[in-house]
C-alpha cells in the first residue's frame, strides 16, 4: 500500500534529479563474471543501458543520453594535494578546490611493494605485510582515525584478521565514512 502511494506521488513529479559522479570508481566486476554476463547480454540482446556491469548512473546516461548534466565543481572534503591529483587525472582541472593546505607533511604517499606476482584471488598477503609492518608503524598514530580501503572483499577479510584495530572495508562500503588517514590496498599487481 505504501509503495502504491510512493509510485503515485513520484508520477506526479515534473522533474527528477539524480545525483552522482561518472568519474567515481565503477562497479567491481571480475573478468570472469564480465565474460559470462556478456554472453547472457548478447544472447538476450540486452542493451548497454540495462547491463548490471554498469553503475546505476552510467545506465541512466546510456538510456537517456541527452539528459542535462551538471558538474558540482566545488570540492570541500579532501586535502588540496589529494584532490588536485584527482582533479588533474580525472576531471581535466575542472574542480574548484575549496580546502586549504596547512603545510602538513606526507599528505599523499605511494608505497610500491617488491615486484612480483603477489595477487591471488583478489588477495595480496604481500600488501598486508607492508601495511602492517611498514606503513602503520611509520604513518599511523591514531588507529581509530585510520581506515584501509580495497576493491576486494577477500582482501578486506584478510586485513581484518591481521589488523584488528583499524577499520578495513571495500571502497564501496567505506564510501561516506570520514577518517583522517586512509590506506589504499590496490591488491592487483598492475
Where are these regions (language model features)?
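Short, exposed "boundary/linker" segments that immediately precede the start
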Residues: 2-3
Amino acid at each position: 500500500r505504501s509503495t502504491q502511494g510512493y509510485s503515485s506521488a513520484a508520477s506526479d513529479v515534473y522533474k527528477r534529479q539524480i545525483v552522482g559522479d561518472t568519474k567515481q570508481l565503477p562497479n567491481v566486476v571480475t573478468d570472469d563474471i564480465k565474460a559470462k554476463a556478456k554472453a547472457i547480454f548478447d544472447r538476450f540482446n540486452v542493451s548497454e543501458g540495462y547491463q548490471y556491469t554498469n553503475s546505476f548512473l552510467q545506465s541512466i546516461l546510456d538510456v537517456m543520453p541527452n539528459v542535462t548534466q551538471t558538474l558540482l565543481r566545488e570540492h570541500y572534503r579532501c586535502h588540496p594535494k589529494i584532490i588536485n591529483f584527482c582533479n588533474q587525472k580525472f576531471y581535466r582541472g575542472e574542480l574548484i578546490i575549496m580546502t586549504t593546505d596547512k603545510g602538513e607533511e606526507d599528505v599523499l604517499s605511494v608505497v610500491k611493494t617488491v615486484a612480483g606476482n603477489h595477487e591471488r584471488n583478489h588477495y595480496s598477503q604481500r600488501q598486508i605485510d607492508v601495511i602492517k609492518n611498514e606503513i602503520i608503524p611509520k604513518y599511523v598514530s591514531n588507529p581509530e582515525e585510520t581506515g584501509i580501503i580495497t576493491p576486494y572483499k577477500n582482501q578486506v577479510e584478510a586485513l581484518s584478521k591481521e589488523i584488528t584495530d583499524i577499520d578495513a572495508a571495500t571502497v564501496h562500503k567505506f564510501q561516506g565514512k570520514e577518517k583522517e588517514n586512509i590506506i589504499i590496498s590496490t591488491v592487483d599487481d598492475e
